[in-house]
Amino acid sequence: TSSATVLADDPALTVRWQELSADTQALYPEENLRQPLRVVIDSQNRVTPEHRIVQQAGETLFARLRADARQWPESARTLLVPEHNGHLDLVLLMMLLGKQQINSVWVEAGATLAGALLQAGLVDELIVYIAPKLLGNAARGLCALPGLEELSQAPHFKFNEIRQVGPDVCLHLTTA
């Protein structure tokens, strides 16, 4: 996720066993639950040790342009990643994560990070939830993709699965 998401939502980004269905709980006993490594892209060092993401069980990795002088718990690590075109180098970040045997990355992010990952060619699968609600043209879009104005420029995906989840629809897409 990005620091913008952490600042806006203060998410935990944890697996909450008690919120899983009874069938899923039966498959995965609570004592076997493993929390994911949370990776936060925080190029301006805006996230603090007081945010919920840092206070959860499991490890949090901060991808940053420079070190942060604050006192952090042992569960928080920093990975320094150089800048590319004015932003943290996302391609290099993924390569560095791969060197740590992190080969699958789930991203929960807003339009800016989602768009940057798409533009960098780092997305091979999308899971998109769509609510049966419409917003106007001034609302924030799913992905910030500046300069993409014609269908011929659009990234191509194929549908793997379409299912209803409560009142919403879940689209599972992979690159075409």
Language model features: what each stretch is:
Residues T1-N103, T112-G115:
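Active-site ligand-binding patch in enzyme domains
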Residues P82-N85, P132, R163:
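Structured beta->alpha junctions
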Residues P146-A176:
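Conserved histidine-centered catalytic loops in small-molecule metabolism enzymes
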